C-alpha cells in the first residue's frame, strides 16, 4: 500500500486533489489523504489540484507530505517534498504506524505519548482526565479529537485510552507554544486526527484488554469508517479470580468505545465530514462479600460527541466550518452518604478563514487567518462529597460520612473566542508568525487578551531554529472550581526556543528549552478557592527519531523543574507532577513477516508529602494525620524494559497480525508511594505492577 497526504504551504490538507500513479488516479479525502493498493514502488506520483501548481513525488511505503504551492505564487511548476513543520518548537507528530510500533504501549495509541519528552511518566496512569505535561496538572492541558475537546482520555481501569489506534490517522503533541486557534489551556495540547475510511478490507481485533471491529469503505464521492470496541476484562477476570477471594465485584471494569466517520467531497472545492465519538465506563464493587451497602462504590462515566464539519478551498482561500455537540454524564456513589451526579450537554461552533497572498508589501509567502469559536455548556450538578483535593494538598483521612461539599443546581458556561494570525517570510531564512487570541469567559466575567508569536530562522538547508512567546489562559472549570464564580482564569506566559536538525532523510534531531511563568493559580485559603498562587516551570528536552528501511528508532530525554507558591509570602514547593528526569530509548526492526522491538525507560519518581504523626478525632472516630512539608519527599526512580513482537501472515483471503507487548519484563517493582495504617503509625510501600503483558490478534478481510 502506497499512501500519503497532500497539503498546502501552511500544512493544511488539500481535499479533492487528483493523485496519479501510472494510469491509476485517486482523489484525496477531507484530510488530504490518499492510498494506492498494489502500486509499484519507485514510480512517479503526480498531484494536481485547482489553484495549485502540480506536485511530484516518488511512491514508497512511507511517502512524505506533498506540499503544493498556489499558482499565484509560482510562475512555473514547483515541487516541494518533505514533512510539514511541527506546529511549535518541541512539538511532535506521531503517525499511526509509529504509534503501533512503539514497544510498551500495548497497541494503545495514546499511551505511546508517554515516550514524548515533556509528558510526565508513571507506572500507573496519573489521571483519567488527561496528561500531565511539563510538570503541570492534567487539567492544565487539553485533549482534542479533530479540534474538539473530549472530557476524558483513559478508561476507568486506566490502562486503555478511549480512542482506538485503528481509527487514528495522526497524533499531534504540542507541549507548549501552541497556535492562537487553540485556547482554554495553560500548558499543552494533544490533538488526535481521526482517519477517513479507505479501500482496504474490514478489520477485527481481540486482545487481552478488549475486542473491536472496524468497517470501512468507499461511497460515491466519499468514504465511511465505523469502529466499535468493548472490554473483555469483565469476562475474563471472574474466571481468573479464586472463589475464596474476599472481594465482590458487582460489575468488573467494563467499557465501550464507538467511532463513526463519513466523508463526502461534492466537488474539488468542498469536503464535508460527519463524525461521532463515544465512550461508556462502569465500575461497581463492594469491599467484601458480606458487608452492606455502606461499603458500596459505583462509578459510571459516559459521553457522546457528534461533529459536522465542512472545508472549502479555492485558490488562495481556505475556510473551515464545524459544529459539534456533546452529551456527557458522570455518576459516582460511595456508601450511603456520598454521591455525585453531573450531566453536561454542550455545543461548540468553530469557523476559520485563511488566505495566502504570495508576495505582499515586500514580504514573501504571506498567510493570514481569522477565526472564532462559541462554546456553550450547561452542567447540572447534585453532589455531597468531601472537599476535593487541590494540587499539593495531601490526602484527607478516609471518612465515608464526610459530605462537607454539597450543591444542587445548574451552571451555564458560555465562552466566546476570536483569533487572528499573520505569517510572512522575511527573505529566504526568516519567517515570522504573529497573532492574538481573545477569550471571554462569561460565567466568571473574565476577558483575556493573549498575544502569541514565533520567529523561525533557517540556519542551514537542514537546520532550523525557532523561538516563540505567548500568553495562555485556563478558565476555572475543574471540579468544584465551577462553584466559585469569583475565580479568574489561571495565567501562563511561555517562552520556547530550540533547534531542529535533519542530517539526512529519515533522521530528525530536535532540542528545546522552555520557561513558563504561572500566575493567578487557583489554591485553597480556608474553605474558599482563590487566585493567589504563582508558579515557575523550566526545562530542556531532546528528541531523535529514525525511519530507515526496516529500522525504527526513538530516543528522548527531558529535564524539568516545576515549583509554585500557594499564598503570598509562602514558601516555594514542588508541583505534584514535578519530574526532573525522563529518558526513553526505543528501537524496532522488521525482518520478513516479523517485527521485534524494545524500549528502555528511566524516570524520576513523583513528589510525596510525608506523615509525621496523627491525632485521634473522637467525633469522627478516626485518626487525622499531621503532615510534614508539602512534597518534601520523592518516590524512587523507576526503570523498566519493554519488549514487543509482531508477526504477519496470510490466512486465506485475510491478512492476520499477532502482537505480544510486555511491559517491565525484568519485574522491577518500584515504589510509587506509601499506604498508611489506620492510626498512621506504620506505612507500607505501594508498588508498581511487576509485569504488564498484552497480546492481541488482528484480521483484515
Language-model region placement:
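Periplasm-facing N-terminal accessory domains of Gram-negative outer-membrane beta-barrel systems
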Residues: 1-89, 134, 424
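Surface-exposed extracellular loop regions of Gram-negative outer-membrane beta-barrel proteins
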Residues: 383-391, 457, 461-496, 513-530, ...
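Transmembrane beta-barrel wall of Gram-negative outer-membrane proteins
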Residues: 209-230, 247-282, 298-320, 357-359, ...
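Flexible loop and strand-edge segments within Gram-negative outer membrane beta-barrel domains
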Residues: 271-314, 319, 323-348, 481
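Membrane-embedded beta-barrel scaffold of Gram-negative outer-membrane proteins
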Residues: 320-324, 330, 458, 466, ...
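Periplasmic N-terminal accessory/gating domains of Gram-negative outer-membrane beta-barrel systems
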Residues: 29-33, 51-55, 62-67, 77-179, ...
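Gram-negative outer-membrane beta-barrel transporters
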Residues: 425-431, 514-517, 531-612
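C-terminal beta-signal and adjacent terminal beta-strands/loops
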Residues: 601-622, 636-640, 646-701
